[in-house]
A protein has these predicted regions:
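P-loop NTPase catalytic phosphate-binding loop
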Residues: 1-105, 111-114, 121-181, 190
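Cell-envelope/extracellular anchoring and linker segments
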Residues: 105-106, 242
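Phosphate-handling catalytic cores of nucleic-acid transaction enzymes
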Residues: 244-246
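Conserved ATP-driven motor cores of ASCE-family P-loop NTPases powering translocation/secretion/packaging/pilus
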Residues: 157-241
Length: 246
């Protein structure tokens, strides 16, 4: 089984008519952060990536923490792996417990598990100082120890800031910045390649750092959004189906 998921197309090669896929090797690059301002296509890309995980990684399980709590993930309402707004702390704890169970041997499986947290920064800002620090420590635990147990983290938010990640920034080995990027974001997330990056890109295009390789990326358009939602739904519902024996 391949450990790779397609992220998008190489924009530089696409300009010459060559459709070359940019792939995420999640065994080598276990954790991801996606950022971009409103209108950048960040949510579209995040949904598409979750759908590919649900469809192409057998037995994958996804926990979605949707702090923004608008309509983008409302189709997941009622699923055991879906947490909204002030319920996001429970979703974070569920991911932590998944990793602990695998460490203890209570969960012997090594199937792909992902916690996707939408608007992590806004979530932290909603907490008091003590609770925010505890949440950052839980995230650091997942980022530092998750790889060996096939436990992964995907953070999606409008902008990046070191204050929201403690010392765990270097654990994000897949970084995707979409649309127009600020100079500060480029410096923080793409510092080794800052002189190569055009920070001004249209909606649906961006920069992808996959391990130590940098790409200009185009996110392909999908004409069947219901298929995307069905694929995400299947992965978020998997814990419930396993309990039911299906």
């Amino acid at each position: 089984m391949s450990n790779r998921v397609t992220l998008g197309l190489d924009a530089d090669l696409l300009a010459f008519g060559v459709r070359s896929k940019i792939r995420w090797d999640y065994a080598r690059c276990p954790h991801a952060v996606v950022f971009g301002a409103t209108g950048s296509g960040k949510t579209y890309f995040t949904r598409l990536l979750l759908a590919k995980i649900g469809k192409f990684i057998p037995d994958s399980e996804i926990v979605v923490c949707d702090f923004k709590s608008d309509d983008d993930f409302s189709f997941l309402s009622g699923c055991p792996g879906f947490f909204r707004f002030d319920g996001c702390s429970e979703g974070l704890e569920a991911a932590v417990e998944k990793l602990k169970a695998r460490q203890r041997g209570a969960d012997a499986s090594r199937s792909f598990f992902l916690m996707m947290f939408d608007e992590w920064a806004a979530y932290l800002n909603s907490l008091d100082k003590k609770a925010a620090e505890a949440a950052k420590q839980k995230l650091s635990y997942l980022l530092m120890l998750g790889r060996s147990f096939n436990v992964h983290v995907l953070i999606s938010q409008q902008r990046v800031d070191a204050a929201y990640f403690n010392t765990a920034r270097d654990n994000f080995s897949l970084v995707v910045g979409l649309g127009r990027l600020s100079r500060e974001s480029v410096q923080m997330m793409f510092s080794d390649f800052r002189d190569e990056i055009d920070p001004v890109k249209p909606r649906g295009q961006g920069t992808a750092l996959v391990g130590d390789r940098i790409f200009n990326m185009v996110v392909p358009q999908v004409t069947t959004p219901l298929t995307v939602e069905e694929a995400i739904l299947s992965a978020v519902q998997r814990p419930e189906r396993r309990r039911d024996g299906n």
